[in-house]
């Protein structure tokens, strides 16, 4: 129900942005959008831990997060056509954009309120046998976790306050690693069309929108493959860190040549690596945080790490103004990804005993 509430409020705030009349009202409304959406991703990630055991969670995360490249691809194509509605019913194109892309969240939130069950034991569509089987899987999942060297023991975890459990070096390392990742995610969502425009001078907005959809389509396939590979191998550390480096290589490739096809290949690599890393990244923090602190812990990592999504647009824009090209901004994002990969490899992680998965 909390997820449904967030979606409705988020949709209302996003739609209300169409009524902005100046910089002040726009800033206030955008801050309101940020406040209403803040709990959505942590809430979904926590919700998935109630339904899927750790050995299946990379795929579960990926299937949920596939929505990001899907909406980015569709948004790149659809937004150009929505903006062409400028003047219809006395509304400007940008107002139609907020209305048609914000209001569906309200409708979907209402549907979620009635259709999405809070936990397996409340799911009417599951039989008693299904509920029992799923609960046994979740119980066994908790028992098979192996403590790595340097991790907090269960007894010690029970003796410390929830806040002391959250603000540990391990959680802070996760936060820094996520900060490095959100920089590239922001660069993909905000700057890809403009980067492609700089590579393809003279192309129309619709053409650029279609080109911007290509990396996202490739990303969908890459995310699903890499998450399945991680679940089959029951390995998280390398499956998280390597996509960081793959994305960094993509940004460097895009900045190193003037050949359009190679630049597009670099952006595709950056998109696949970034989103694949994100899907598997979120399978790991919950293994270092107890159930009682999991919701707040995930929220802390998400909220603090998301500062990177605000830094990246500023830095890339500033460096472009300073140098006259996107290259230095792409180097900045690539450097953060390399640092993030190093942090991931340095984090002590729990693991599950290997088991076959479908």
Where are these regions (language model features)?
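Cytoplasmic helix-loop-helix junction between adjacent transmembrane helices
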Residues: 29-66
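Glycine-rich segments within core transmembrane alpha-helices of 12-TM secondary carriers
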Residues: 59-83, 104-105, 302-312
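C-terminal transmembrane helical hairpin of 12-TM major facilitator-type secondary transporters
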Residues: 234-284
């Amino acid at each position: 129900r909390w997820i449904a509430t967030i979606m409705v409020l988020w949709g209302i705030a996003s739609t209300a942005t169409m009524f902005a009349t100046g910089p002040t009202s726009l800033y206030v409304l955008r801050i309101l959008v940020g406040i209403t959406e803040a709990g959505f991703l942590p809430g979904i990630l926590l919700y998935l831990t109630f339904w899927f055991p750790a050995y299946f969670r990379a795929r579960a995360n990926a299937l949920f997060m596939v929505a990001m490249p899907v909406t980015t691809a569709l948004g790149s194509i659809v937004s150009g056509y929505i903006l062409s509605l400028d003047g219809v019913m006395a509304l400007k194109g940008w107002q139609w954009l907020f209305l048609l892309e914000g209001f569906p969240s309200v409708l979907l939130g209402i549907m979620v309120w009635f259709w999405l069950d809070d936990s397996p034991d409340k799911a009417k569509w599951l039989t008693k046998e299904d509920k029992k089987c799923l609960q046994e899987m979740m119980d066994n999942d908790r028992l098979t976790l192996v403590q790595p060297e340097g991790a907090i023991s269960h007894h010690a975890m029970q003796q410390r306050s929830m806040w002391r459990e959250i603000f540990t070096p391990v959680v802070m390392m996760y936060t820094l690693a996520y900060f490095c990742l959100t920089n590239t995610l922001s660069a993909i969502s905000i700057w890809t069309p403009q980067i492609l425009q700089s590579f393809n001078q003279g192309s129309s907005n619709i053409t650029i929108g279609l080109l911007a959809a290509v990396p996202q389509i490739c990303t969908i396939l890459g995310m699903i493959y890499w998450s399945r590979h991680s679940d089959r191998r029951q390995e998280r550390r390398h499956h998280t860190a390597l996509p960081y480096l793959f994305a960094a290589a993509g940004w460097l490739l895009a900045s190193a040549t003037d050949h359009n096809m190679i630049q597009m290949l670099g952006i595709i690599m950056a998109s696949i690596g970034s989103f694949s890393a994100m899907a598997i990244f979120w399978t790991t923090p919950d293994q270092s945080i107890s159930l009682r602190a999991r919701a707040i812990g995930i929220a802390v990592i998400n909220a603090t790490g998301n500062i990177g999504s605000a830094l990246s647009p500023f830095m890339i824009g500033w460096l472009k103004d300073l140098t006259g090209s996107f290259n230095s901004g792409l180097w900045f994002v690539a450097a953060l990804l390399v640092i993030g990969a190093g942090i991931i490899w340095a984090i002590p992680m729990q693991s599950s005993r290997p088991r076959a998965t479908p």
